[in-house]
Amino acid sequence: MADQRPDPDQLLNRVNAEEARAKRGKLKIFFGASAGVGKTYAMLGAARQQLLAGVDVVIGIVETHGRMETEVMADGLEYLPLRDIPYRDRVLKEFDLDGALARKPALILMDELAHSNVAGSRHAKRWQDIDELLAAGIDVYSTVNVQHLESLNDVVSGITGIRVWETVPDKVFDAADEVVLVDLPPDELLQRLQ
């Protein structure tokens, strides 16, 4: 008669994998069809709800693009200081991954998931920074447009005639714990972009 007991190594591997998943932060993506539909605004609104519920929320990086209503929504939220990175003949401000890991908030806002970091950063892409934050047990809210997804980049480019070069691997999007669709009727979007 064959031994029906489970393999102890397999059990240990399964338990370790489940513990790692339980400790990993959660990723929530605010997803839109184009710039200007209100992804950042929606992300800030959701973050404010978490703050009211007592969650330790900080802004890692948020791009308001000069929109007053978005700037107002960010008022009162803690901003992590950005890091100065010398680049050619100037100094650029970039997200400070080490500062965020040291601060270890419960939730961090990281706008523009597809952003390419400045040379000299630890990771080439913001989504890689986010993966490190998640691995450290920090929940992350981020934003992305459809044309930035690797598998849809060519399709959207073929329709719009505009190619974007900053993309996110589909596996990053697929691994999100939650995706919130943010959209506007076309005439409202056109009015907002004027």
What are these regions (language model features)?
Residues S142-Q194:
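Internal gly/pro-rich beta-alpha loop/helix module
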Residues R24-A102:
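Conserved P-loop
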Residues L11-R14, R88-F95, G161-R163:
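Short gly/ser/thr-rich secondary-structure transition/capping motifs
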Residues D56, K104-L107, A136-S142:
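Loop/turn-to-beta-strand initiation segments
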Residues E112-W127, S151-D154:
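Conserved ATPase-coupling elements of RecA-like P-loop NTPase cores
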Residues Q49, E63-M68, A114-H115, V140, ...:
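Conserved nucleotide-binding/hydrolysis micro-motifs of P-loop NTPases
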Residues K125-N145:
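Substrate-engagement module of ASCE P-loop NTPases
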Residues D9-K23, F30:
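Pre-Walker A adenine-sensing motif
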